[in-house]
Design a protein with these regions (language model features):
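Aromatic-residue-lined binding/catalytic grooves and analogous aromatic/hydrophobic interfacial grooves
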Residues: 2-232
């Protein structure tokens, strides 16, 4: 994502890397000291939020009271680095000041078939942090590109191809014709599936990709794993 505020150009990149098993976000600015941010969490479920050095940690147990006892415990770690800026950790947030580049590494684990999920979460983040952003990205591209490039789709471009994505959406809602946007969404869906469901994933992606807890996504079904007409 590219955008400009005033005379500063910002670039944001995000990818889920299977080889390193983390989410990686990078934000850069064309001007020094242009990135100032406070990273905190607003959780939908009860959880404890703390900091450990440059890491923001959240952990708890997911319960579904209406469905009886059960649920998995989880821990997530968000590691933050800003080489040309400063970090300030508080009880439940980390501030980034006067940076021109910000990198965030995220891993989340549950105790589903893994009692050592907390130590694995920490080890995974620490290991990824030791690699440069360029190395993480290159490894990711080498892994997923051969899979992604198996399919291509050409439907034409249309007159709105040069607009930002949100502006293209606006034109389509007004009745505009933009087949290139259909291609973009098709390939985006493929990328999400490749990022969330691989041969070494603990569980495959569900029908809509995520479990519905009636908080993050309020639908009339739970989107869980069960046998019904979909198996046909």
């Amino acid at each position: 994502t590219n955008y400009t505020i005033g005379d500063v150009n910002y670039v944001r990149e995000c990818f889920a890397t299977n080889p390193d098993d983390v989410l990686v976000l990078r934000m850069s600015a064309s001007k020094k000291k242009a990135i100032n941010a406070k990273l905190s969490l607003s959780m939908l479920r009860e959880s404890e939020i703390s900091t450990d050095g440059n890491q923001l940690i959240f952990e708890g147990t997911v319960n579904f009271p209406k469905q009886g006892p059960g649920g998995v415990s989880f821990q997530g770690r968000i590691a933050i680095s800003a080489p040309n800026g400063t970090l300030q950790a508080e009880d439940s947030s980390i501030s980034v000041n006067d940076a021109d580049m910000l990198t965030i590494v995220i891993d989340v684990r549950t105790n589903y078939k893994n009692d050592a999920y907390k130590s694995l979460c920490k080890e995974t983040v620490v290991k990824a942090e030791k690699k440069t952003y360029e190395k993480l990205k290159k490894t990711h591209l080498n892994d997923y590109t051969p899979l992604f490039d198996r399919v291509s789709l050409q439907l034409g471009t249309g007159e709105y191809a040069g607009l930002p994505t949100d502006k293209r959406w606006e034109q389509v809602k007004k009745g505009g014709y933009d087949p290139g946007l259909d291609v973009l969404l098709f390939q985006y869906g493929r990328y999400l599936l490749l990022a969330s469901s691989r041969e070494n994933s603990p569980l495959p992606a569900a029908l809509q990709g995520f479990f519905n807890d009636n908080l993050a996504c309020n639908m009339g079904w739970t989107n869980d794993y069960h046998l019904d007409i979909n198996t046909q």
